[in-house]
């Protein structure tokens, strides 16, 4: 049965829109855990557009579940991760001009650098995941580089409908099975919401789904704890 990682970046987005102290994403992480979140996900971007360094340090000290740090594989971020020691790190591509992460890592073009970065984190007892598109080549490179996990990018699945969405779902399923055969743990995320999550959650051996925007959007109407509970129920009711 898949677990639920709640991404709280969008709480920090609201705070940073006014450069003030509220809403505090650390407080909302607590509410997400009350609602059933199995882990808390944050993306510390190089431009610090939402999550700040203080958020990371406080989350590490206060949350009761697990902390998943999304970050680019830069020297600065590697050093921060080794100071904070999150439960796991998810390496993601990052472009300053993007609104949100637009696609998976291109592992093929960065094999040697990523091997070094992954080994560096693992030497500090941090498990490492690669955020990748559901492609066999990327999964094989994930194994070669030495990642513990992969997170399959579900953004294309989320945007499609009908037979096109079904085809993308099959690609995600096949990617999950390939990764499992290689000994990789499989997570998934990006664009998942209350209408499309169940088919992804029902994939055999899907480990965790990382979801943020749809939960926070619904929380504006019904509150964060309840919105997390509803999503958790959809994931676990298969």
Curated annotation (Swiss-Prot):
One cellular-component annotation, GO: cytosol
Compartments in which it is found: Cytoplasm
Enzyme Commission number: 2.6.99.2
Catalytic residue positions: 43, 70, 190
GO MF, one annotated term: pyridoxine 5'-phosphate synthase activity
Keyword NADP: no
InterPro entries linked: Aldolase_TIM, PyrdxlP_synth_PdxJ, Pyridoxine-5'_phos_synth
Gene3D superfamilies: Aldolase class I
Binding site for 3-amino-2-oxopropyl phosphate: 7, 18, 191, 212-213
Keywords: Cytoplasm, Pyridoxine biosynthesis, Transferase
Gene Ontology BP term (one): pyridoxine biosynthetic process
Swiss-Prot/TrEMBL site (Transition state stabilizer) positions: 151
Enzyme class: transferase
Binding site for 1-deoxy-D-xylulose 5-phosphate: 9-10, 45, 50, 100
Pfam assignment, any one: PdxJ
Annotated pathway: Cofactor biosynthesis; pyridoxine 5'-phosphate biosynthesis; pyridoxine 5'-phosphate from D-erythrose 4-phosphate: step 5/5
Catalytic reaction(s) noted: 3-amino-2-oxopropyl phosphate + 1-deoxy-D-xylulose 5-phosphate = pyridoxine 5'-phosphate + phosphate + 2 H2O + H(+)
Source domain of life: Bacteria
NCBIfam families, per the entry: pdxJ, PRK05265.1-3, PRK05265.1-5
Quaternary assembly: Homooctamer; tetramer of dimers.
Family, per entry: Belongs to the PNP synthase family.
Job of this protein: Catalyzes the complicated ring closure reaction between the two acyclic compounds 1-deoxy-D-xylulose-5-phosphate (DXP) and 3-amino-2-oxopropyl phosphate (1-amino-acetone-3-phosphate or AAP) to form pyridoxine 5'-phosphate (PNP) and inorganic phosphate.
HAMAP family attached to this UniProt entry: PdxJ
Name of the protein in its database record: Pyridoxine 5'-phosphate synthase
The organism of origin for this protein: Prochlorococcus marinus (strain MIT 9215)
């Amino acid at each position: 049965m898949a677990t639920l990682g709640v991404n709280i970046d969008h709480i920090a987005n609201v705070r940073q829109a006014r450069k003030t102290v509220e809403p505090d994403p650390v407080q909302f992480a607590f509410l997400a855990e009350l609602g059933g979140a199995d882990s808390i996900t944050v993306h510390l971007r190089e431009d610090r557009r939402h999550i700040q360094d203080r958020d990371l340090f406080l989350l590490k000290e206060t949350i009761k579940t697990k902390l998943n740090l999304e970050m680019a594989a830069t020297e600065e971020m590697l050093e921060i991760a080794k100071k904070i020691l999150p439960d796991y790190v998810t390496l993601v591509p990052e472009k300053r001009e993007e609104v949100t992460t637009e696609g998976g890592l291109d592992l093929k073009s960065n094999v040697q650098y990523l091997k070094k970065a992954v080994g560096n984190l693992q030497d500090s007892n941090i498990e490492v995941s690669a955020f990748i598109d559901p492609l066999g080549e990327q999964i094989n490179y994930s194994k070669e580089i030495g990642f513990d996990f992969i997170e399959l990018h579900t953004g294309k699945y989320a945007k499609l409908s009908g037979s096109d969405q079904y085809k993308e779902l099959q690609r995600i399923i096949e990617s999950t099975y390939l990764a499992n055969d290689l000994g990789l743990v499989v997570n998934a995320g990006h664009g998942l919401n209350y209408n499309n999550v169940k088919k992804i959650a029902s994939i055999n051996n899907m480990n965790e789904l990382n979801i943020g925007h749809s939960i926070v959007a619904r929380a504006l109407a019904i509150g964060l704890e309840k919105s997390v509970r509803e999503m958790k129920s959809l994931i676990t009711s298969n």
